[in-house]
């Protein structure tokens, strides 16, 4: 049996289901590139049949990613499999992941079928997927609540049909680690052709043991772990990949397996996912939380100073978290900024140097010293907002005092035209938003507002993340500045640009569909 554990990332599929607003194709690609840099073996990037937007993003990622295998999800439905293959075919090689429920409860109440019919359907769909690729993964949905003998029948038939990877999910996060290990061991005992496939696991965290279940399964013989960065996902989330990866690395003495992950990219990838998905990482989160390497106890601090291994089982550097440096000021040139970005692991393609340096100089004039975390925040915002903007914040002014009412004046560039409006609101942020909405005429409802400090001290950058509802769809925006009101205004303008771009994409899709229809009529 191979000693490599394949890392299968589903941040962009299962993980995205936890978000209040769907990611754009560009945001998904940004995360996919970070995952590729970290070295994930397989990335599941969407469910193409679900929407034209998901199809487009899967296709874009499949065309771009070269060093990780790109995968798409499909139910055991002919159309699902055909559409997934259509989206993925631009890749040099790809995986189709198809699934059907196998537990008695799901078969009886959801599928209204029988186990024999489920097996027959699974076999047919696996063979259909094999017409497009020899890399087919099959999942037994709700395997954790499927009797092992029934599960063994399904797995044996799926392998005979051509599935190269068999995934055993604990779909509802119900199974205990010793039970889950027993399921994997039971399959190895019961399935005669199990050596012809890789056994995978996909665990959920409803009882807080997703990582424990995955590690127990690996110890029992599973050689692929599925999960998401930071553990994001439906309900209580997925197995946190960074925790599994580092557990395997730190406890290689008893796990006796390894991954091909570049663990020095873990922290940056985690931050990228957190920022783009607008899901802050808890301070006490294992591996990537801000307190993961903090020592407040005097006894612990003394022990760490004498020997870090007294209280640290791994180092911050092992996940790519280096010490903060205070070496950039308004007198630092472009070369110094570029060099520092390279030291932090960024490539030229990760940011626009002209835009980044302009933002750096403005911030350095305000703060004096610019920290690494400032640069990273600027680079992230730079990447998020580098697309052409229809709306641009030209000027704003706010008057407020001890009363509840605030007044804001805003000038907004709308294409080539500058428009101005004033409005009152319950506080400066509300007043700004009322004025912006008057200018654009967009009917948006604010459903989430988050403010996070990026850095330390009174002059730290403030990042505002908002989610708005617009005609039944949710859109995310982000703004960054040392002034909270300015951050809030920038976040709303970012949202409006995302809404505008979505409308333009919809128009383009409709145009293509109409052209296709016209061509049919011509033929």
Curated annotation (Swiss-Prot):
EC numbers listed for it are 2.3.3.13
Q: What class of enzyme is it?
A: transferase
Which parts of the sequence bind Mn(2+)?
14, 202, 204, 238
Q: Which GO terms describe its molecular function?
A: 2-isopropylmalate synthase activity; acetyl-CoA C-acetyltransferase activity; manganese ion binding
The UniProt entry's GO CC annotations, sorted and at most eight, read: cytosol
Pyruvate carboxyltransferase domain boundaries:
5-267
Q: Which residues cross the membrane?
A: none
Under catalytic activity, the entry for this protein gives: 3-methyl-2-oxobutanoate + acetyl-CoA + H2O = (2S)-2-isopropylmalate + CoA + H(+)
What top-level branch of life does the organism fall under? Bacteria
From the UniProt record, give the pathway where this protein acts.
Amino-acid biosynthesis; L-leucine biosynthesis; L-leucine from 3-methyl-2-oxobutanoate: step 1/4
A single Gene Ontology biological process assigned to it is: L-leucine biosynthetic process
Q: Which InterPro entries match?
A: 2-IPM_HCS-like (IPR050073), 2-isopropylmalate_synth_dimer (IPR013709), AIPM/Hcit_synth_CS (IPR002034), Aldolase_TIM (IPR013785), LeuA/HCS_post-cat (IPR054691), LeuA_allosteric_dom_sf (IPR036230), LeuA_bact_synth (IPR005671), PYR_CT (IPR000891)
Q: Where in the cell is it found?
A: Cytoplasm
This protein's UniProt keywords? Amino-acid biosynthesis, Branched-chain amino acid biosynthesis, Cytoplasm, Leucine biosynthesis, Manganese, Metal-binding, Transferase
Region spans: Regulatory domain: 392-523
Q: Which cofactor does it need?
A: Mn(2+)
Keyword set includes Transmembrane: no
What the entry lists under HAMAP family is as follows: LeuA_type1
- Described function: Catalyzes the condensation of the acetyl group of acetyl-CoA with 3-methyl-2-oxobutanoate (2-ketoisovalerate) to form 3-carboxy-3-hydroxy-4-methylpentanoate (2-isopropylmalate).
Sorted alphabetically, which PANTHER family does this protein's record hold? 2-ISOPROPYLMALATE SYNTHASE 1, CHLOROPLASTIC-RELATED, HOMOCITRATE SYNTHASE-RELATED
Report the family membership.
Belongs to the alpha-IPM synthase/homocitrate synthase family. LeuA type 1 subfamily.
Tell me how this protein assembles.
Answer: Homodimer.
Name of the protein: 2-isopropylmalate synthase
């Amino acid at each position: 049996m191979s000693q490599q554990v394949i890392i299968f990332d589903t941040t962009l599929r299962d993980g995205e289901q936890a978000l209040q607003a769907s990611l754009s194709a560009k945001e998904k690609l940004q995360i996919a590139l970070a995952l590729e840099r970290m070295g994930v073996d397989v990335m599941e990037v969407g469910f193409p049949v679900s929407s034209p937007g998901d199809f487009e993003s899967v296709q874009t990622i499949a065309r771009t990613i070269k060093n990780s295998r790109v995968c798409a999800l499909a139910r055991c439905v002919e159309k699902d499999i055909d559409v997934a293959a259509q989206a993925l075919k631009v890749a040099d090689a790809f995986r189709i992941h198809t699934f059907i429920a196998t537990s008695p409860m799901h078969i009886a109440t959801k599928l209204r079928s029988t186990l024999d019919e489920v097996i027959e359907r699974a076999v047919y769909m696996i063979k259909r997927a094999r017409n497009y690729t020899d890399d087919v993964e099959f999942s037994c949905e709700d395997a954790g609540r499927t009797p092992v003998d029934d599960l063994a029948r399904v797995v044996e038939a799926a392998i005979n049909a051509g599935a190269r990877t068999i995934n055993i999910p604990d779909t509802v996060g119900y199974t205990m680690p010793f039970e889950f290990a027993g399921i994997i061991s039971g399959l190895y005992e019961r399935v005669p052709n199990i050596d012809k496939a890789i056994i995978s696991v996909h665990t959920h965290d409803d009882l807080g043991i997703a990582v424990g279940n995955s590690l127990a399964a690996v110890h029992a013989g599973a050689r692929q772990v599925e999960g998401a960065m930071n553990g994001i996902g439906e309900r209580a989330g997925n197995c946190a990949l960074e925790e599994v990866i580092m557990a395997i690395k730190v406890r290689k003495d008893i796990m006796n397996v390894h991954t091909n992950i570049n663990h020095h990219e873990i922290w940056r990838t985690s931050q990228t996912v957190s920022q783009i998905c607008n899901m802050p990482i808890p301070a006490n989160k294992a591996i990537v939380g801000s307190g993961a390497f903090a020592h407040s106890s005097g006894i612990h601090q003394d022990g760490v100073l004498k020997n870090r291994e007294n209280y640290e089982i791994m180092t911050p550097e092992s996940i790519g978290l280096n010490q903060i440096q205070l070496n950039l000021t308004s007198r630092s040139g472009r070369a110094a900024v570029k060099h520092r970005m390279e030291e932090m692991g960024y490539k030229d393609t990760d940011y626009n140097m002209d835009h980044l340096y302009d933002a750096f100089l403005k911030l350095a004039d305000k703060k004096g010293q610019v920290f690494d975390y400032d640069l990273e925040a600027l680079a992230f915002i730079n990447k998020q907002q580098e697309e052409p903007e229809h709306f641009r914040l030209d000027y704003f002014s706010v008057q407020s005092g001890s009363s509840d009412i605030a007044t804001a004046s805003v000038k907004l560039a709308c294409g080539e035209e500058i428009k101005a409006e004033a409005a009152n609101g319950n506080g400066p942020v509300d007043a700004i938003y009322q004025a912006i909405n008057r200018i654009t005429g967009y009917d948006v409802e604010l459903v989430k507002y988050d403010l996070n400090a990026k850095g330390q001290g009174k002059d730290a950058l403030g990042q505002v993340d908002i989610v708005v509802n617009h005609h039944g769809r949710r859109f995310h925006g982000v703004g960054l500045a040392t002034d909270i009101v300015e951050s809030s205004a920038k976040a709303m303008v970012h949202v409006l640009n995302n809404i505008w771009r979505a409308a333009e994409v919809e128009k383009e899709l409709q145009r293509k569909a109409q052209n296709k229809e016209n061509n049919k009529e011509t033929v």
